[in-house]
C-alpha cells in the first residue's frame, strides 16, 4: 500500500493525496452479494431534510458484509480483497468449504489465499472470529458485538481496534480507541486483529468536487446567512454575540447529546476528550 501525492498539473490536483493498494481486485464485485443502495438526499420519509449537507454523489451498490461471522467450524479461504465505497475499510471475499461466499471486513495483514475460521475452536490469529471469553486478555480485536448474535458494532472503520483489558465472569472489559472503557458480555464475538487500510486517514480529497462525488454538499456558516435563515445571521460585522446554536436554536459545539441511561452501568470509564 502506498500514499501517493499527485503532481500539481492543475489546481484540483495540487493538494490531492491518494492511497493506492495494488492488492485490491480491479474487476467488478461479486454480484450475488450486492444490493441496491438508493440515495436519500438527507431526507426522511416525509421528504424533510433530517441531515444537512447530503445530496448527489456517484451511484453505489451496497455490499452485503457478514458482521455476524457465524459459520462455525467451516474453514474459508480469502479469494480477493476489494474496495467498498460504503465504508473506509476494505472488504475481503471469502469462499467457505461448503461453497458459500461472503464478504467480511479485511483485517490488517490479510491477503488472498489466507485461511480463516469462526467458532470457539478457531486459532488465535488475525481474521478469525471467536467469543471473547475464548480470546486472551490483552488481545486487539475489531468488529465487536455488543449483544451476542447481533453482529459486530464496535471498531469497524479503517485502522480501528479494541483491546480486551480484563475478563470477570460473564463480562469482559474493553478499551476503545476513544479512551472509553466498557463492559460487554463475554459471549459476544469479536474478530482478532485490527481493521486494515489504516492509511485511509492520510488521504486528501484536494478539491470540493471530490467531496461532491461522495455525496457531501457545502456547509455554510450561520454568520454568513441572513437573520431569517439562522440565529447567527445578520448584523453589521461578523460577531453574533451569543452562545453558538444550531439553525433550530439548540445549543451546539460541545453540548452532550447522549441520553441512553439504560447502558450507563456498563461504562467503566468515560471517553477522554
From Swiss-Prot:
Biological process, per Gene Ontology: cytoplasmic translation
Signal sequence annotation: none
Gene Ontology terms: cellular component: cytosol; large ribosomal subunit
PROSITE patterns in UniProt: RIBOSOMAL_L2
Domain of life: Bacteria
GO molecular function: rRNA binding; structural constituent of ribosome; transferase activity
Keywords: Ribonucleoprotein, Ribosomal protein, RNA-binding, rRNA-binding
SUPFAM superfamilies linked: Nucleic acid-binding proteins, Translation proteins SH3-like domain
Region (Disordered): 28-53, 221-273
Low complexity: compositionally biased ranges: 39-48
Stored HAMAP family: Ribosomal_uL2_B
Function: One of the primary rRNA binding proteins. Required for association of the 30S and 50S subunits to form the 70S ribosome, for tRNA binding and peptide bond formation. It has been suggested to have peptidyltransferase activity; this is somewhat controversial. Makes several contacts with the 16S rRNA in the 70S ribosome.
Quaternary structure note: Part of the 50S ribosomal subunit. Forms a bridge to the 30S subunit in the 70S ribosome.
Family: Belongs to the universal ribosomal protein uL2 family.
Name listed for the protein in its UniProt record: Large ribosomal subunit protein uL2
Organism annotation: Klebsiella pneumoniae subsp. pneumoniae (strain ATCC 700721 / MGH 78578)
